[in-house]
Structure formats: structure tokens, C-alpha cells
Amino acid sequence: MARFFIDRPIFAWVIAICIMFAGGLSISQLPLEQYPNIAPPTVKISATYTGASAKTVEDSVTQVIEQQMKGLDRLTYMSASSSSAGSASINLTFAAGTDPDVAQMQVQNKLQQAESRLPQSVQSEGLTVTKGSSDFLMLVALASDNESVTGTQIGDYISSTLLDQLSRIDGVGDVQTLGSGYAMRIWLDPARLEKYALMPSDISSALEAQNTEVSAGQLGALPAVTGQQLNATISARSKLQTPEQFENVVVKSSSDGAVVLLRDVARVELGSESYDINSALNGRPAAAMGIQLASGANALSVGEAIKAKLKELEPFYPTQMQLKTVIAYDTTPFVSLSIKEVVKSLGEAIVLVVLIMFLFMQNLRATLIPAITVPVVLLGTFGVLALFGYSINTLTMFAMVLAIGLLVDDAIVVVENVERVMSEEQLSPLEATRKSMDEITSALIGIALVLSAVFIPMAFFSGSTGIIYRQFSVTIVSAMLLSVLVAMTLTPALCATMLKASDAQLHAQRGGFFGWFNRSFDRSADRYQRGVSGVINHRGRALLVYVLVLVAMAVGYVSLPTSFLPDEDQGALMAQIQLPVGATDSRTQAVMRQFETYMLKQPEVEALISISGLGMGGNSQNTARAFIKLKDWSERSGKGQGAAQVAQRATLALSSIGDASVFVMQPPAVRGLGQSSGFDVQLKDLGGVGHEALVAAREQFIELAKKDPSLLGVRSNGLDDTPQLKVTIDDRK
């Protein structure tokens, strides 16, 4: 095979150029991400049962939906939560590799079968099925420089204008409005209702009947009478818009012509649709959008599309509101930085390899031959990644960095052996190359097979570990196989055409720096040879040292801490604020002000968005979350300015707040695997002992975990049972 390309160097160049061309075209098509898509596909069902307790939501909504989710293909597990705010959430996790669109369709079909058994109010308020991870890709906050603009006004603009625009971006799983728009609020007066013998249901019926769109048809519509001269659309009643229109709704009328209007029994005002969640940007009222990534979508491309859409919409913001867009939490810059750093390391590795080759070969032509093979093999590897549907991520790039040293070895072996044959047998470069390839072709293939046998098994790992290392394995194996291919095609052709017989004689005659280096290297080689001879002469002592080294390695392996992936400074932090059960929103807001005051004083913090009422385990008045955007890494290069150090200091300092527990933490190392750094543990009532016993077991487990010195920040992400006021209805009265 090698002789064929030695005699046809142009054909070897054509193959190399085709490999480079295919790889170069593939680079622009490959997605960029920090890690392979490790998180399994998830589908989330959300429902709202306004006014219901957590127990009622669980019995009449959550369990009904859970019981229907049977027979779903590749469903791994399912979790659900019910809150006293009347919300229910069911998360279904599927096996890795499942098509998220198919999973969502199957869940939607199952949900339709359960809808008839759900309360009417749940059906009317709607059930949503979304595919995506539970954590946020980014948080986009809108704030105003005009102090008269309220968070409700901003939230109403987001709901009416921005929400649909961003939801339609490819790769966006869900857009959650962290604020509220306008709604007409009707405050009933019980005394007046009793005076006019009215019930709240009468008010609801009147509103449903009169707050409607009426289709009145057309004037002169076909078939028309003979001589009809005008055709026009008739507009009648439309939906009510102002408080005055609602006040004039007739809620009761009598035969004598007397009517009771809504304003006679209630106070009508324009207010916020919901007061459950309130957002603040750097302590000022705002509204935000929490954008979640769809399962299988690429974070970088989706993030760029969102930013482009926001930039496109900014000129159309209402001028009187003076709105400004702030991306207060963004997970994509760290991904871009990670890829850039790995690409930088790849470039540095290439330069160092070329310099080291020149240092030892001391021949520009001989150095140039292995250097040419590097871009050919690397670009070809990108083509293989595209063929397998992989991405450019830190693991595939790390595999390429590691492969550089391996792939130049093949070319160096060929070049060195050709020079040796030319020097020892006084052959021409062409003949020396032919003879050299006859000698080492089998060795090149053998080396490739041995190295492949080391890395190929990693491609067959199961679970998340397999997903992580499969791309690493395929990348490094494909680079090595391409390296052998190039070493048997292009490298011999280059040796036969570029090397000169005179170059093989110059190595021993070098002077200057290279002469000094050669003499120093020869002395080092002599000392090494004498050392090896000494080891051979004292085998017992050498074997003892070898055993001690093995023992030291084993001890080090056992004692080193282990983790799935290391926690890195992603340029962002999260905080969970939890108040005692039953605490009101005013108490939560007071704690949030203390939290904001502390965090905004920290020199590492750039922006802070705080959201009261939003919790990791559910929404309630006594919980809140915050997302902290840190300054660029170049501005936090000092000691103690890393994200982990900032989080530890903040958690310690804010522990003095007696009315709340505050935990500041880093985002999860891998998107979609948890809501924060560390790991989650869930307890399951397999014995059916009941809710109270399960809560008691949870508290006992947390206390035991806090005593473990290897654990930090042990906490409950769920909401405790809220106080309930039971009303007993006397049906006779």
C-alpha cells in the first residue's frame, strides 16, 4: 500500500486534501457545547388548581395524572410535587437517547385520557406539557429607569409581547414569566351580597354571560334580498376592558325594571393577575423571564438566538416605559470560555510539538513532514465527529489535545527510519522510503490497534458515564486511525519527495546550540544507560522500589476525593432563601432586602435578580430564590474571588439572619442534572407509612447528614407543610 502512494505522491496529496476539506466543512456544522448531552430527556406536566390545598391537589390532580402515565416507552422514573399554592408538577424522565418530541407526544396523549377525571377548574385553567430541563438556561430581566413604572406593567408587557416571541425560538423548552400581568380584580362585599340575596356564583355567571365576544354577522350577507346595496360586518359586544365597564355589569334584575350592578356589591380595580411571585433587579422592581432549554437542544446556539431576538425587539419597546434588558443570569458564557481555553491549549500543544520535533530532528524538511500531518488528521477527526452526530465540546477537544502527541509519533517513526536507512545504506530518499515502509508498516498498524484497544472499550460504558466518555473515545481512536492512514499514504510520499540524502549526514556534525544539545543529550543517555545497568544488577532492590511505588499509587487512589465532574467557576451563583412555615410575603421581602444589600456590596457581583415566592421545591410566600451574575473572570483574578469562595462567604455571613436560612451555591456542573451543585437525595415511602412519618424520616436523615464532615450545605429543597385553617360547612344552614 505504501509503495503505491510513494510512486503516486499527487494521489496521496489528493486524499489528504479531501480529508481536510471534509473536516473543514464539518467544523461549521458541529454544535458547540461544554459537555455532551448527558441529561436524560424530561417532560414536565404543570397544572393549577386555584385555592386548593396541597393535599387536595395531590388527591384530585397529581395522583390522577400519575396513574394515567402507564405504558410510556423508555420511561425511567417519574416524580411529582403538589404545593399549597394550588400548583402541581409532574416530571417524567426518559432513558438517554429517547426522542424528546416522541416522549412529549406520548405524554400528551396519556394526559388527554386523564383530563375528564380532573376538576373542571383545572381543565379550564389549562394543563401544559413541556419538554426541557428543570433549571434555567438564562434569566432575562426587564427594568425601567422610570420609577413610576411598576413591575406589574413590565410583567404585562412581557406576557403580551415578548413571551410568544421567545417561546417560538427553536430549542427553547419553556419560558416562565417571573412576574405578573394585569387582571381585573373584583372585591365582593359580603354584606351587600346578603342584602341583594346574591351568591358569588351569581357574580361569576353574570360575568361569563356579559364579558363575551358576540358575533353578530353581516348586513347584506348572501343570500340577500333583491336590491340590497350595502354589505357590512356588524360589530356588537366585545370583551370588557376597563373597570367602569365591569362595574356596569348587571348581576340581578327584577320584573319591575330594577337592576343590581356589579358596582353595587363589589369594588372593581385593575391589579396584578397574581401576587405570588415578585421580581427585583438589583433591588429595584422588575419582571423577568426564566428560559429553559428543550431536551437535546444546544445551549450556545439557543442562547445566541435569544440574545439576537432581544436585540431585534429592543427598538420597539414602549418609549414611555424606558425599559432596559438585562441578562441577569446566563450559563452560556462559561461554555464559550471553556471551548476557547481548550482550543487555545490545542494550539499551544501543536506549537510545542513542532518545536520539540525541530529540536530533536534539527532538520526543517524532516520537521515539516510530521507538522503537515497534524492539520490533516485533526480536520479529518472533525469530519468523523460530524459523521457520528457529535459536537465540539471540552471532552472531544481534550481528546484531540491528547491525540496530537500520538499522531505525530507515527509520522516521526516514518521520517526517522527513512533517515536511518539513507544514512546507513547510502540510498536515495525514494529507495530509502520504500525499504523503510516495508520494515515498519506492520509496526504502525500494530501500534494503532494496541492504542485503539485501550480507548475503544470506553465507548461502550453505560449510563451518563458512557455518554461522557463515548465521544472522547471515538475522537481519540478516530484520530489515531487517521494518523496511521496518513502515515502510510501522505508521509511516505513526502519523505520520498522532500528529504535529501545529504540531510541524514548532518545530524552528527552540528555545531552551536544544536551541537551543545546533542552532546548534553548523549551524556544524559549514557547516564541513563548506566542507571539501567545498575537496576539490572540489583533486581531485588529495584523490585522493592517498584512495589512501594505501586502501594503509594494505590493509597493515593483510595485517598483522593471522587466526584462525577468538578465544580467550576461558571461566573454565576444561585441562592435559596427559606423562612419558617407560614411566614408571609412581607417577612420574605424583608429578608430579601438584607440579602440584596449584602450581595450588591460584594466587589465580585455584577447583577442580582431576586424572586420572592419561587422555591426549588415549590412556590410559597415563605420562600425565595436569587440568581447572581458575577463579573468577568478577568476582573476576579485575585485570591478568594472565585465563585466557590464568594458563595461560602455569603452563606456564612447571611447565616446571621435569624428569621431565615440562606444558602448560596454554584449552578450544577452539568445542565439538567440537578438544580445546583452537589447531589440530590429523594426519600420514598415504600412501606406506606404515611406523609407525617416520611417528613419525620426526612428530618432525621438531614440531621444525620449534617454530622458527616464530608457533607456541606445539607438542606431540604422541599416545602414544609403549611398551617391550615379548616372550615366545617353546615349543610343544613
Where are these predicted regions, by residue range?
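Short acidic/polar micro-motifs at solvent-exposed secondary-structure junctions
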Residues: 91-92, 146, 184-189, 195, ...
